[in-house]
């Protein structure tokens, strides 16, 4: 176990603080409207020192959204380990999504950046995040489909329903 005073640990802690503050700004001001100077000012840093951790604003957006999708996939992993019941998976996945948002708002843990502006990113970053979001989306939609097959969820258009639920969760934040 490494020391919390090691350079690597300090770098990771500072990086996490930057991503968390940037995520909060992206959610309130929008990723397009937030500048690196905004992030630096909120952290009491110079813009120059921020460049030690991120290359560009797009890189910062990418890192925040990537962290968000990792957290969403982890929450689905937990849900899948807890239950095989598809309706319960839908409900628990939504509950976990809400918990992530509420924890962010209450200052517990890292702030969650709702991945709402992926389109502003360069092609390679955008494509990777879109693939990860689609993978998460398909997992969630699969819970709905399995529930319909088992008769515990009424017949619906699963793509539209999954999209509506996930979008509502991100926009309610």
Residue spans of the language-model regions?
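Hydrophobic alpha-helical connector segments
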Residues: 63, 77-106, 161-165
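Hydrophobic/aromatic residues within well-ordered alpha-helical segments
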Residues: 14, 57, 68, 72, ...
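Amphipathic alpha-helical segments used for helix-helix packing
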Residues: 89, 102-124, 141
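Hydrophobic alpha-helical segments that form the core
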Residues: 95-96, 141, 155-173
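N-terminal intrinsically disordered/low-complexity leader segments
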Residues: 1-13, 20
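Helix-turn-helix
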Residues: 17, 21, 25-59, 63
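Amphipathic alpha-helical packing segments from all-alpha helical-bundle domains
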Residues: 70-73, 113, 123-150, 159-163
């Amino acid at each position: 176990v490494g020391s919390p005073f090691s350079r690597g640990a300090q770098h990771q802690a500072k990086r996490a603080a930057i991503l968390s503050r940037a995520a909060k700004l992206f959610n309130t001001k929008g990723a397009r409207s937030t500048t690196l100077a905004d992030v630096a000012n909120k952290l009491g840093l110079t813009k120059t020192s921020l460049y030690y951790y991120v290359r560009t604003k797009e890189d910062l957006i990418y890192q925040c959204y990537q962290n968000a999708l990792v957290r969403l996939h982890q929450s689905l992993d937990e849900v899948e380990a807890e239950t095989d019941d598809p309706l319960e998976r839908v409900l628990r996945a939504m509950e976990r999504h809400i918990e992530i948002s509420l924890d962010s708002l209450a200052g517990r843990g890292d702030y969650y950046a709702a991945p709402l502006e992926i389109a502003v990113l360069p092609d390679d970053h955008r494509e990777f995040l879109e693939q990860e979001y689609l993978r998460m989306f398909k997992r969630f939609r699969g819970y709905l489909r399995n529930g319909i097959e088992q008769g515990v969820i009424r017949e619906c258009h699963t793509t539209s329903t999954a999209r509506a639920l996930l979008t509502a969760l991100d926009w309610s934040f």
